[in-house]
Regions:
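Alpha/beta enzyme core
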Residues: 10-21, 34-59, 65-86, 95-230, ...
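Generic N-terminal amphipathic, Lys/Arg-enriched alpha-helix
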Residues: 1-27, 300-301
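Short catalytic/ligand-gating loop segments at beta-alpha or beta-beta junctions
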Residues: 233-239
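A short N-terminal beta->alpha junction/helix N-cap motif
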Residues: 3, 24-32, 59, 305, ...
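Short catalytic-loop micro-motif centered on adjacent basic/acidic residues
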Residues: 26-30, 91-92, 114, 231-233, ...
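An acidic- and aromatic-residue-enriched active-site/binding cleft used to recognize and process polar
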Residues: 148, 236, 281
Length: 333
């Protein structure tokens, strides 16, 4: 067994406590590649922000769990090389769907895991979550649970409809499971197509689609039930229209891709929401830069030539999210 502490990683307990008290949210960025890891670390160091590096089941299948673990260890050392004496980096399993996968990640150096039992009945979700919590807490690994279902498709996570979290269930769920944080459903959605055009209104000035607002009334009720308890938002990419436009300009086909408006995420970050997950925006930033590079340099074939601008574009996006949306900059240590 490898402890996350041997890798220089931290769990989420203290950083969430500080985030809730400070009215900001910790960025949780998914990564699959070295370039994503480098961009995340560079952005976190430059903004003096704690950061959560997330690995989905699909990422583990693509890049191998052991390799990703050592990439996370490398991220800690890389942050130090960049001048950060005490980086606060979490290696988190995103959407673990079984006790076995959570245990495997805990045993392999992950400092935080999510057990997603949201597709189960209330009692089954409690039982599965508690089983993971009981194992994880033996090794000081923190556990995120989920109550409510997000719509959308991203990696292996798929649901046709969302089911909002019921505030009346959260006290019993948190108490009986002992989870450290709770992912809720208040209108966010996985993927780059978070809403259909029929669900949106059209801005008369810009002509852009405007998605429906998040259910902040449900969030407020949950905060009343669980004061100070760490809340998590999944599916929170904003799907920047400039990146979508670049992709479409250079041969892509992403019609009506739409995300969560950043002003709504800013509002959420000032509440008990202390972790906000962002994945699709990174994919869009990477894809836009690569498509543009090949259009402008059709003779290039060295991966470094097109992955370098992709890395820079992702870093720019990560810094924007940290500083302008989540407010976690300057909160390291």
């Amino acid at each position: 067994m490898t402890s996350y502490k041997e890798l220089g990683l931290v769990n989420t307990r203290e950083m969430f406590k500080k985030a809730v008290a400070g009215g900001y949210a910790i960025p949780a960025f998914n990564f699959n590649t070295m370039e994503q890891m480098q961009a995340i670390v560079q952005a976190a160091v430059e903004t003096k922000s704690p950061v959560i590096m997330q690995v989905s089941k699909g990422a583990r299948a693509y890049a191998n769990g052991t390799i990703l673990r050592y990439m996370a260890q490398g991220a800690v050392e890389y942050a130090k090389e960049l001048g950060c004496e005490k980086p606060e980096i979490v290696l988190h399993l995103d959407h673990g769907d079984s006790f076995e996968i959570c245990k495997e990640c805990i045993d392999n150096g992950f400092s935080s895991v999510m057990i997603d039992g949201s597709h189960l009945s209330f009692e089954e979700n409690i039982a599965l979550t508690k089983k993971v919590v009981d194992y994880a807490h033996q090794y000081d690994v923190t556990v995120e649970a989920e109550l409510g279902v997000l719509a959308g498709v991203e990696d292996e996570v798929s649901a046709a409809e969302s089911h909002y979290t019921q505030p009346g269930e959260v006290i019993e769920f948190a108490t009986r499971t002992g989870c450290d944080s709770l992912a809720i459903s208040i209108g966010t959605s996985h993927g780059a197509y978070k809403f259909t055009p029929a669900q949106c209104t059209k801005d008369p000035e810009t002509g852009l689609l405007v998605p429906p607002p998040l259910a902040f009334d449900i969030l407020a009720e949950i905060e009343k039930k669980l004061p100070g308890f760490p809340i998590v938002l999944h599916g929170s990419s904003s799907v920047p229209q400039e990146e979508v436009a670049t992709i479409n300009k250079f041969g892509g086909a992403l019609p009506n891709a739409i995300g969560i408006p950043e002003e709504q995420l800013r509002k959420a970050a000032k509440s008990a929401v202390c972790k906000i997950n962002i994945d699709s925006d990174s994919r869009l930033a990477m894809t836009a830069a690569i498509r543009q590079h090949f259009a402008e340099h059709p003779d290039h074939f060295d991966p470094r030539q097109y992955l370098k601008p992709a890395r820079e574009n992702m870093k720019k996006m990560y810094i924007h999210k940290i500083v302008e949306v989540l407010g976690s900059n300057g909160h390291l240590g």
